[in-house]
Amino acid sequence: MTFVLISIMIYARKVGDNMSDSIFEKFEYITPEIARENGISKFKFYKYICDNHLEQVSHGVYTAPNQWVDELYLLHRRCPKAIFSHDEAFYYHGLTDREPIKHTLTIYSGYNAHRLTADGSCKIYTIKKELLDVGKTMVTDYSGNSIPIYNLERTVCDLVRSRNSIEIQEFNSVLKAYIARKDKNLNVLMEYAAMFRVQNILRRYMEVLL
């Protein structure tokens, strides 16, 4: 289902000091960081928010009134380094038809994810910093926004790494769904598995299913 999001068009205005006639890019969501990157002062940013009655949909993120909220994209904006994984990746890649109860993301060990977990809507997994970007890919979500998510092979490695916290029925179902995929890449899968030290365990499962 395609959601047509109302874009926010911000034009530079003269507020207090002399502002150039530059035009801000179109944004579905606007943040102080986006404004700052475009040379807009904090004062002008918040004046625009106030004058146009924009709604705060997350910490530091604003959008047009009554705008449909793309939760995945908002999470990405709140924590750009985090990558959607596990349940979220199972569902996105079509390895399960069970929509995630919570958004699942992976971030490097030591990152303070309290802001993401405080409301109970997210489950966070951690990994060594040097392994965080292995298998990372940018995809278009269901609302047309670009978000980071792990590819199929990294997703299967995460499945095996987290097998003790995943229901056995779901584990088997996801793994079988991957095996049935025509676009699977077993060479890449085993390369990743070696990096995450799950190659022996994964090989045993694969020998049974292949």
For each feature predicted by the language model, list its residue ranges.
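Short, positively charged and aromatic/hydrophobic N-terminal segments
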Residues: 2-17
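Short helix->loop/beta-hairpin flanking segments within DNA-binding domains
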Residues: 19-23
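Nucleic-acid-binding surface
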Residues: 24-34, 49, 61-210
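Short amphipathic alpha-helical interaction segments
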Residues: 38-49
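A short, conserved structural fragment
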Residues: 53-58
